[in-house]
Amino acid sequence: MMAENNLKMLKIQQCVVANKLPRNRPYVCNICFKHFETPSKLARHYLIHTGQKPFECDVCHKTFRQLVHLERHQLTHSLPFKCSICQRHFKNLKTFVKHQQLHNETYQNNVKQVRRLLEAKQEKSMYGVYNTFTTEERWALHPCSKSDPMYSMKRRKNIHACTICGKMFPSQSKLDRHVLIHTGQRPFKCVLCTKSFRQSTHLKIHQLTHSEERPFQCCFCQKGFKIQSKLLKHKQIHTRNKAFRALLLKKRRTESRPLPNKLNANQGGFENGEIGESEENNPLDVHSIYIVPFQCPKCEKCFESEQILNEHSCFAARSGKIPSRFKRSYNYKTIVKKILAKLKRARSKKLDNFQSEKKVFKKSFLRNCDLISGEQSSEQTQRTFVGSLGKHGTYKTIGNRKKKTLTLPFSWQNMGKNLKGILTTENILSIDNSVNKKDLSICGSSGEEFFNNCEVLQCGFSVPRENIRTRHKICPCDKCEKVFPSISKLKRHYLIHTGQRPFGCNICGKSFRQSAHLKRHEQTHNEKSPYASLCQVEFGNFNNLSNHSGNNVNYNASQQCQAPGVQKYEVSESDQMSGVKAESQDFIPGSTGQPCLPNVLLESEQSNPFCSYSEHQEKNDVFLYRCSVCAKSFRSPSKLERHYLIHAGQKPFECSVCGKTFRQAPHWKRHQLTHFKERPQGKVVALDSVM
């Protein structure tokens, strides 16, 4: 007997060591054959098979099988744990403590003190919910150890798998909610807009969009939000602002209160909940510490961080600093070179603006044999040259045959003109030297002076006044926002918006907005077209006549050239330039009726790079074929015949696919390409097959 008792005690001790006691489960379910220790547990288990849920919630009418589940559910309606910083409610202590750790990194030191207060609140709110057990009863109810498979099953996570996608979930309710994605069901429907959602929380968030109420208000700037999460993100902006934190601490010192701990900018929260409560409850403090975070003082725009504010263009221009990203990306020497190169390009554009004046000016030099020929003696008298710019008067050429220089007007020297072989570089600035010294002086010797000068940076990205001869457009249109350089052009532009055409033709009644357009139109009614007296050619308008007469030179020879000798001839141009008189000793005998040009002049025109035969030939093309209807002139009879189709309204070329007609064959062929299509094998339909 003693041996048997010892064996029993040994077994009990082994069970105690293994955290296990022998169980006796005599009560078996006749449906699923599960075993239970007590009849109460068996009766509770029968509710699963019958589907009964006798415990109902008075608030939301949700039913449960056990009373403990109902009491735990009722905590969701009361939420006894409230955060003093963000005013958020929690139903249990564990989630509330985790939430407090997010607000403050050093909150773990005060966890014990907070737990005592919260446990006292929890005991009051949870009174009568949980039954207290003794140590022996807890041991009897929970005898299983970690090695027991039932224990590992309870501790296992994500044990509910979806049969469609195989995704795991920790509970059946979350699995059921996930199945709604596959079935496409959205049981929660909005009454106002009939929009449906899978979860009730999503529906509640959506219903806030229909109301103009903003229940969540910031205690610092009084800004309202519909969702609490957006309010929390907004408060982090205040806590990241250094000026806001400094002002908050200063406010605390003046009120002779204990100085709060340093605010954590990384976590974006406060050290304790008392600060948030005082700021929210005291309205005077709210208005005194109202600061818009990271706001530009010029344009009043707000930014998320101080770095973005420093890179803001208005803020950088006001403070005289260059953005940090601009300094990192480029070296200041390269920036200086780029800006100066931009100024040089702006200066060099002047040469392109006066190409027509250069050609006229060049012709007058080529006619002057004094400047081209280097074989003539230096004892000849000085000859006068009438320049192309009549407003500057008459300019003399100095008879120095070694330098071959010519004194020009002041405006031509400022433009950087340097005619090869005629002018020296002493009197005229080159393109490299055309940049003003003022632009170079303001840059500064060091990189800091250069980057801190906003005028230099602005001139690098906008063309200054001194470097380009452009008229400033100061008269804007209030309808289309176009800008014009003078009020007269603005008034002329207003006629487009009003639709007025004040200049009417007396013959056909057609009206125009400008008098120049009316004069050009009246040429079509005249019997005689503009007439060139030299070559006896008629033109359709005065523009063609002026271009023709400006490019031709009238040679009036006093007598025919029979043999080489010393003779005089006059060269006169028909445009605004005054006449040029020159003398020469060498003539080339030409045929009768043709002007005689000096040998040196012909050689210079052939060898001069400025002379272009193609340009001269294109400008002197004669329009000999004139339309009898609109008096328009053409170079060839084929173009005139094609033009007559416009007056006749004929379109002889017809598309065989869509029946569209065209006036010209190229237009018809180009239209045929629109009907091209690629076959499935990748072969393209041929043009002949389409035609």
From Swiss-Prot:
Cross-link annotation Glycyl lysine isopeptide (Lys-Gly) (interchain with G-Cter in SUMO2), location: 11, 112, 121, 146, 262, 420, 437, 683
TM stretches of this protein: none
Coiled coil: none
Keywords, comma-separated and alphabetical: DNA-binding, Isopeptide bond, Metal-binding, Nucleus, Repeat, Transcription, Transcription regulation, Ubl conjugation, Zinc, Zinc-finger
Zinc finger region(s), C2H2-type: 27-49, 55-77, 81-103, 160-182, 188-210, 216-238, 294-318, 475-497, 503-525, 625-647, 653-675
Main location (coarse class): nucleus
Region spans: Disordered: 258-277
Family matches, as Pfam families: zf-C2H2
Molecular function terms, GO-annotated: DNA binding; zinc ion binding
Xref: InterPro entries: Znf_C2H2_sf, Znf_C2H2_type
Gene Ontology cellular-component terms listed: nucleus
GO biological process: regulation of transcription by RNA polymerase II
Subcellular location: Nucleus
Family: Belongs to the krueppel C2H2-type zinc-finger protein family.
Role, per record: May be involved in transcriptional regulation.
PANTHER family: ZINC FINGER PROTEIN, ZINC FINGER PROTEIN 672-RELATED
Name of the protein in its database record: Zinc finger protein 770
Organism taxonomic ancestry: Eukaryota, Metazoa, Chordata, Craniata, Vertebrata
